Amino acid sequence: MMNNNGNQVSNLSNALRQVNIGNRNSNTTTDQSNINFEFSAGVNNNNNNSSSSNNNNNNNNNAQNNNSGRNGSQSNDNGNNIKDTLEQHRQQQQAFSDMSHVEYSRITKFFQEQPLEGYTLFSHRSAPNGFKVAIVLSELGFHYNTIFLDFNLGEHRAPEFVSVNPNARVPALIDHGMDNLSIWESGAILLHLVNKYYKETGNPLLWSDDLADQSQINAWLFFQTSGHAPMIGQALHFRYFHSQKIASAVERYTDEVRRVYGVVEMALAERREALVMELDTENAAAYSAGTTPMSQSRFFDYPVWLVGDKLTIADLAFVPWNNVVDRIGINIKIEFPEVYKWTKHMMRRPAVIKALRGE
């Protein structure tokens, strides 16, 4: 998508571009947020109080009784709707557990013969959050195997997998070296990996030994998992998967993605300016005065990072989603040049290339 070196990144880009546009379920089996509009309708409390001006006390009492009845009816209706929805959800869960026709043998066999060490990553070929975890595993040099679940076979509903991730979504990770500890939610997995690496080696690779920096890394990581990924996911959903074409929804989520990128762009631009002013001392005065554009600095293409002066999970968490954002009509090279350079630096890393290829 964004490499000037020819086929290297254009090839690996295909690893994430196989988004299975025809599979409407693929957007609901990753750990991104999905808005449930079933509960968006609130109770209408605007009662008709015209009878309150009537001087007849009986009419006033009748009006109050009628209003009370309406409120009670509305509350009952909403309560019944919620109960019905919960019952439907329970029945769906039961139906999944009763699906005797679904072949779970591959998943069942794995859990019967689990490895004694390393990691097992459960992912999907179309799940950016799964590739996010693979990138960090690769960067840290951890030995891992990936099981790409087949959603069409319902493998994510296999009881053994649900025991790993009760949300029945990907990614999920098993740490075999910690008595087959299971971790789910991509952000939680990344934090587990960097903290374990730090504990085992004393090297805060992709992390930090400074509490202030750790807090900033967490902030950006949570920003990515709660704002960046879900908004791109929703924009993709309403553009490609939704049963109806709702232009306002596509526009709303695409605009929100642009807002999110604006936040990242500003942070990276501030770090770029600080870097150039620190390293390019002979031209710093000209940059400050505005007589020479900062873009002319030989340090203008040097990598900058969200936290501190090194790559962390705060940066890497964005990579797989940045690699598919053009599918919603956003050209980060033109609209967000610092985000583009930042992403390009990360996508050229051997561990990232390996992970995005699914190796």
Swiss-Prot record:
Gene3D superfamilies: 1.20.1050.10, Glutaredoxin (3.40.30.10). Residues 39-82 are annotated as: Disordered. The keyword Secreted does not apply. PROSITE patterns: GST_CTER, GST_NTER. Keywords: Nitrate assimilation. One of its GO terms (molecular function) is transcription corepressor activity. One of its GO terms (biological process) is regulation of nitrogen utilization. InterPro entries: Glutathione-S-Trfase_C-like, Glutathione-S-Trfase_C_sf, Glutathione_S-Trfase, Glutathione_S-Trfase_N, GST_C, Thioredoxin-like_sf, Ure2. The keyword Isomerase does not apply. It comes from the Eukaryota. Residues 44-81 have a biased composition (Low complexity). Homodimer. Belongs to the GST superfamily. Plays an important role in the cellular response to the nitrogen source. URE2 gene plays a major part in the repression of GLN1 and GDH2 genes by glutamine, and is required for the inactivation of glutamine synthetase. URE2 gene product may catalytically inactivate GLN3 in response to an increase in the intracellular concentration of glutamine. This is Protein URE2. The gene is URE2.
